[in-house]
């Protein structure tokens, strides 16, 4: 069977369900596909089991079980991620395996916010999930409307405590199971939820519209022409003749891109996602190295000290077999290269065990081009032992 062509006419948004175990994340995901399939034959219903038995995938050396579901509303096309286990959520959010433009926090009205609700909201704040919509689930199991109001208030307060606009964001009361069972009054609540997602979560800025950056992978000297750096453009556009900066490791230098080539052909410009070679004016081969970035002037700066939210691989995942302590000195792998750094643990934390997630303060021995939200891996001798996200730049 021929693959269906991806329809680009509708804007595309990435979302996911987060929240405490057994509050109905996967049931809600299945219910959304079922209700939307009734409106539009393009949408395929995905059963609970097909989502729950998510295949494992690798992201930055870490195995994560993630279910990818797609569907469309009248306005948009969505890619939706749902993870079977709590640890999978933590890994997914920290590694950015599936970036989210917004998240649906599922809270059971029967329980209210629970420890994992809190942890997922904190992680969403830390790793930069920008928008949250709340699905208050299992409302068919609560008779007392005052109790529902109380749970809603509690969720809003919790979100406010993590700097989300708790008073303003939508809280939609649903019964995922009722909708999955085809009960019209509950199907309607899923429609309401998707209308809230459509209107509240804005369109993400496309990678192509952001300031240009390309991590350098390789450097070549071309006789009589100068130095070419190659890599995959992370974001933005680079036009021939534009001034750029080389950032990281040493003092930032300015240069002009005098040529862009892809697959041995010359182009006028390179765009986000392209693997290109950039010819740089006035740059000797030994002035640039792998791990630096070529960037739009002023858009990114080099730093040595940052805070990061980190997931430490368990022994079973090929990680460390023993804990680490303050003063831990591994390599931090940013974009295309390893840099040694020293990690300090949060106050009151004696050690970090394999399988934990923790907030670390890191000082690198050489400056790296970074901004908030940048992902990194932690490696020992080329083996990945952790993954993280820069949550704050300190120096």
Swiss-Prot record:
The record, for InterPro entries, names: EF-Tu_GTP-bd, EF-Tu_GTPase, EFTu-like_2, EFTU_2, G_TR_CS, P-loop_NTPase, Small_GTP-bd, T_Tr_GTP-bd_dom
Extract the ranges annotated as region (G2). 61-65
Query: Is Transferase given among the entry's keywords?
Result: no
Whether Transmembrane helix counts among this entry's keywords is no
The entry's keywords: Cytoplasm, Elongation factor, GTP-binding, Hydrolase, Magnesium, Metal-binding, Nucleotide-binding, Protein biosynthesis
Pfam families, A to Z: GTP_EFTU (PF00009), GTP_EFTU_D2 (PF03144), GTP_EFTU_D3 (PF03143)
Q: Where is this region: G3?
A: 82-85
Report the EC number(s), separated by commas if there are several. 3.6.5.3
Binding-site positions, Mg(2+): 26
Q: Which reaction does it catalyse?
A: GTP + H2O = GDP + phosphate + H(+)
Annotated stretches, region: G5: 175-177
What GO MF terms are annotated?
GTP binding; GTPase activity; translation elongation factor activity
Q: Which GO terms describe its cellular component?
A: cytoplasm
Subcellular compartments: Cytoplasm
Give binding positions for GTP. 19-26, 82-86, 137-140
Q: Where is this region: G1?
A: 19-26
Query: Which intervals hold domain tr-type G?
Result: 10-205
Q: Where is this region: G4?
A: 137-140
Q: Which family does it belong to?
A: Belongs to the TRAFAC class translation factor GTPase superfamily. Classic translation factor GTPase family. EF-Tu/EF-1A subfamily.
NCBIfam families from the xrefs? EF-Tu, PRK00049.1, PRK12735.1, PRK12736.1, small_GTP
Q: What does this protein do?
A: GTP hydrolase that promotes the GTP-dependent binding of aminoacyl-tRNA to the A-site of ribosomes during protein biosynthesis.
Subunit details: Monomer.
HAMAP family in alphabetical order: EF_Tu_B (MF_00118_B)
What is the recorded name of this protein? Elongation factor Tu
């Amino acid at each position: 069977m021929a693959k269906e062509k991806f329809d680009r006419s509708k804007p595309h948004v990435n979302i996911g369900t987060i929240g405490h175990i057994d509050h109905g994340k996967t049931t809600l995901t299945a219910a959304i596909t079922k209700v939307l399939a009734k409106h539009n034959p393009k949408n395929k219903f995905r059963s609970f089991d097909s989502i729950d038995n998510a295949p494992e995938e690798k992201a930055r050396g870490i195995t994560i079980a993630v279910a990818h579901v797609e569907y469309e509303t009248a306005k948009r096309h969505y890619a939706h991620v749902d993870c079977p286990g709590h640890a999978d959520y933590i890994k997914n959010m920290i590694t950015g395996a599936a970036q989210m433009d917004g998240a649906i926090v599922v809270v059971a009205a029967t329980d209210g916010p629970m420890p994992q609700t809190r942890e997922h909201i904190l992680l969403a704040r830390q790793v930069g999930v920008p928008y949250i919509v709340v699905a208050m689930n299992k409302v068919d199991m609560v008779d007392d409307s005052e109790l529902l109001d109380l749970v809603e208030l509690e969720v809003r307060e919790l979100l406010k405590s993590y700097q989300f606009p708790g008073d303003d964001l939508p809280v939609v009361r649903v019964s995922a199971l009722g909708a999955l069972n085809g009960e019209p009054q509950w199907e309607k609540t899923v429609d309401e939820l998707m209308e809230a997602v459509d209107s509240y979560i804005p369109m993400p800025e496309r990678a192509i519209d952001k300031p240009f950056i390309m991590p350098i992978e390789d450097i070549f000297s071309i006789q009589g022409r100068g130095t070419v750096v190659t890599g995959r453009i992370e974001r933005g556009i680079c036009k021939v003749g534009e001034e750029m900066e080389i950032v990281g490791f040493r003092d930032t230098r300015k240069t002009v891109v005098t040529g862009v080539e892809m697959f041995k052909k010359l182009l006028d410009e390179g765009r986000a996602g392209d693997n290109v070679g950039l010819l740089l004016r006035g740059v000797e081969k030994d002035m640039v190295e792998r791990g630096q970035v070529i960037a739009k002037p002023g858009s990114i700066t080099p730093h040595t000290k940052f805070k990061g939210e980190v997931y430490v691989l368990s022994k079973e995942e090929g990680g460390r077999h023993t804990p680490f302590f303050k003063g831990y000195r591994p390599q931090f792998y940013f974009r295309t290269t390893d840099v040694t750094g020293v990690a300090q643990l949060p106050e009151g934390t004696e050690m970090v065990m394999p399988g934990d997630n923790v907030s670390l303060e890191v000082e690198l021995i050489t400056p790296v081009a970074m901004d908030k939200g940048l992902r990194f891996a932690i490696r020992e001798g080329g083996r990945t032992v952790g993954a993280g996200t820069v949550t704050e730049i300190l120096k």
